[in-house]
Regions:
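Glycine/aspartate-rich loop-and-adjacent alpha/beta segment that forms the canonical ThDP
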Residues: 2-4, 13-15, 19-22, 250-349
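N-terminal amphipathic, basic-rich helices that act as targeting or association modules
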Residues: 2-93, 101-103, 349
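Cofactor-binding active-site loop characterized by glycine-rich and histidine/acidic residues
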Residues: 49, 57-190, 208-214, 219, ...
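Short gly/pro/ser/thr-enriched loop/turn and capping motifs at secondary-structure boundaries
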Residues: 96, 202-205, 266-268
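Conserved thiamine diphosphate
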Residues: 158-162, 214-246, 290-315
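A glycine-rich, aromatic-flanked flexible loop/lid motif
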Residues: 190-192, 210-226, 263-275, 290-293
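A short, conserved beta-to-alpha structural element at the edge of catalytic cores
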Residues: 190-210
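Short beta-alpha connecting loops at secondary-structure transitions
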Residues: 202-207, 227-232, 277-286, 311
Length: 349
C-alpha cells in the first residue's frame, strides 16, 4: 500500500505590515498639573450632582445623562488637546466634556434648564449642546451619529491644513452601530486626523457589554480597517493623559486614525429615569471603593505632600462655582416664544 505523502510543515505567518503605536506610559504630572486635574474632575462631579438635584426638582426637563464616575476620561484626554485648533464631539452624556474643555458652567447649567442664556439658547437641553467658538460640536441624541460627524470634522482639519485633530467620543453601545464602521473605513482610507474614543462604562443602557458584543475587547474593533487600538484604564486620569499623548503623536504625524478604549464605569443609571436594577448596589460600591478616579488623584497628591485639609478650600471653591451656576440658571429668563421660528432653516453658509 502506497504511503501517504509527508505533510508539509505550515509556513510561518507573515510578519505584520501594520505599524503599531507605542504602549502609552502613565503621564508624569507635576503637582500643579495634578491639582488642576483634581479641580476639573471635582467640578464635573459636583456639577453633575447638582444637575441631578435640579432634575429631581423639575428645573430640568427631558433626558439627562450624568457623567459621574467617568470624569478621568474627559479630563485626562482633553487636557492634552490644543483648544485653539482641536475639535471635540460626543454623544448625549456631554456635560463633563464641555466642562473639561473650559466652557463656563453657568451657560451649561442654563442650557440644562432651558434658559435663553444657555449655550444653545435654551433649545438644546442636556443632549444637544454646541459651541463652534470652543470647537465643541455636540452633544448628539442619536446613538453613534457623532462618530461619522467626527470623521467629517477630521476631514475638515485635513482639508484646511490647520493642524487640528478631531476627538470623537462614543460608548460601548454605540460601538455596535453600523455608521461607526463606515466612519472607521473612510477615516483610514483618507488617513484622517481623528481619535476614536470608546467610553466603555460597561453598560449600554441596561445591557452589559459582554451580552451585547461578540468581541468585547472594543479596542480591537478597528483591526479589519488597519486602525490600531489601545485599551486604557479610564478610571486613572494619568493613564488617560498618557494614552492621549501617544494617540496625538500617532495622529498628528499623519498615520491616520487610532482607537482608544477607555475602561470606565458610571455610578448613576443610564439617565435620570433609569433605576439601574440590572446591577447590584454592591457592584457600584465596590467600584467606588477600589477605583474612584477622584480619590485616586487625592492619593497621588498625598504622596506629594498635600493633605486632606489642603484640599478643603478647593472643595469649597468648586461648590461655590456650582451653586452660582445653579442660581444663574434658575434666575435667567426662558427663551422668547419668537425663538421657535429661528434656527429652522440654514440662513448662512
Amino acid at each position: 500500500m502506497a504511503k501517504a505523502p509527508a505533510r508539509k510543515a505550515s509556513p510561518a505567518p507573515a510578519a505584520s505590515n501594520r505599524e503599531r503605536p507605542n504602549e502609552p506610559q502613565r503621564y508624569k504630572a507635576s503637582k500643579e498639573e495634578l491639582l488642576e486635574f483634581y479641580k476639573q474632575m471635582l467640578l464635573i462631579r459636583r456639577f453633575e450632582e447638582k444637575a441631578g438635584q435640579l432634575y429631581g426638582l423639575g428645573f430640568i426637563g427631558g433626558f439627562c445623562h450624568l457623567y459621574i464616575g467617568q470624569e478621568a476620561v474627559a479630563v485626562g484626554l482633553q487636557s492634552a488637546l490644543d483648544g485653539e485648533k482641536d475639535s471635540v464631539i460626543t454623544g448625549y452624556r456631554d456635560h463633563g466634556h464641555m466642562l473639561a474643555y473650559g466652557i463656563d458652567p453657568k451657560i451649561i447649567m442654563a442650557e440644562l434648564t432651558g434658559r435663553a442664556a444657555g449655550i444653545s439658547r435654551g433649545k438644546g437641553g442636556s443632549m444637544h449642546m454646541f459651541s463652534t467658538e470652543k470647537k465643541f460640536y455636540g452633544g448628539h441624541g442619536i446613538v453613534g451619529a457623532q462618530v461619522s460627524l467626527g470623521a467629517g470634522l477630521a476631514f475638515a482639519h485635513k482639508y484646511n491644513e490647520d493642524g487640528g485633530v478631531a476627538m470623537s467620543y462614543f460608548g460601548d453601545g454605540a460601538a455596535n452601530q453600523g455608521q461607526v464602521y463606515e466612519a472607521f473605513n473612510m477615516a483610514e482610507l483618507w488617513k484622517l486626523p481623528i481619535i476614536f474614543v470608546i467610553e466603555n462604562n460597561q453598560y449600554a443602557m441596561g445591557t452589559s457589554v459582554n451580552r451585547a458584543s461578540s468581541e468585547d475587547q472594543l479596542y480591537k474593533r478597528g483591526e479589519s480597517f488597519r486602525i490600531p487600538g489601545i485599551q486604557v484604564d479610564g478610571m486613572d486620569v494619568l493613564a488617560c493623559r498618557g494614552a492621549a499623548e501617544e494617540a496625538l503623536e500617532w495622529v498628528r504625524s499623519g498615520k491616520g486614525p487610532i482607537i482608544l478604549e477607555m475602561k470606565t464605569y458610571r455610578y448613576r443609571g443610564h439617565s435620570m429615569s433609569d433605576p439601574a436594577k440590572y446591577r447590584s448596589r454592591e457592584e457600584v460600591q465596590s467600584v467606588r471603593e477600589k477605583s474612584d478616579p477622584i480619590e485616586a488623584v487625592k492619593r497621588e497628591l498625598e504622596t506629594l505632600g498635600l493633605k486632606e485639609d489642603d484640599l478643603k478650600p478647593i472643595e469649597a471653591e468648586i461648590r461655590k462655582i456650582v451653586n452660582e451656576a445653579a442660581d444663574y440658571a434658575e434666575q435667567t429668563p426662558e427663551p422668547d416664544p419668537a425663538e421657535l421660528y429661528t434656527d429652522v432653516l440654514v440662513e448662512t453658509y
